[in-house]
Amino acid sequence: MCIRDRGKTSATIHLGKVPHYLNVQVNPATLQPDEVGAITILMDAKVLKRKGRVSTLLPIMIQSAGKKEVSGEIQISANVTDNFSKLSAADKAQAPIAELSGTLLEFGKLPNKKSIVPLIGGKVSGTFEITNAGKTPLTIYSVTCDDERVDLSGGKKELKPGATATFKVTLRPKEIKTKLEALINVVCNDPNGPIRLIKVTAYK
């Protein structure tokens, strides 16, 4: 990612504690006015030792000459999958197959505070299903959403051939001011589609 010094003095970039599975480099560490630098982030999946979606916050501090230090965070997210490069055609023929009931979950117009219909616990919910249409067990490493306004529950971590799991998606309308457009990431061991995306939409 790029970073630019839009001020009139030099700016030095400092990083906070970096997770052990990340290698982060800032070049250059000190930017001159209007200079563009780069922050390079590399993730080592072998060091991480787990599969699925990984999200973390990287603290960053910027110190400009004669000014108060400014701090913030960079959100880093990645999907870690199996290495399918050595699978033969026969292996793939026996592999699990993840089938989703849909790739779009539309909640439509959300009720507001003045709505006549009361909300149960102030929430609305919907569901989607994942079915294993393959010949071997389907492992679901993670089902996540980076948007904190979306809660996920239910489902299973492993599905036998022919089995189906139901996942519940819950929204809190009071936290959505105008509209919501978010993605649910499904990471699994289906070699033909290890990462599946489900779009969630809602509006006021």
What feature does the model see in each segment?
Residues 12, 28, 38, 57, ...:
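Well-ordered beta-strand positions in beta-sheet-rich domains
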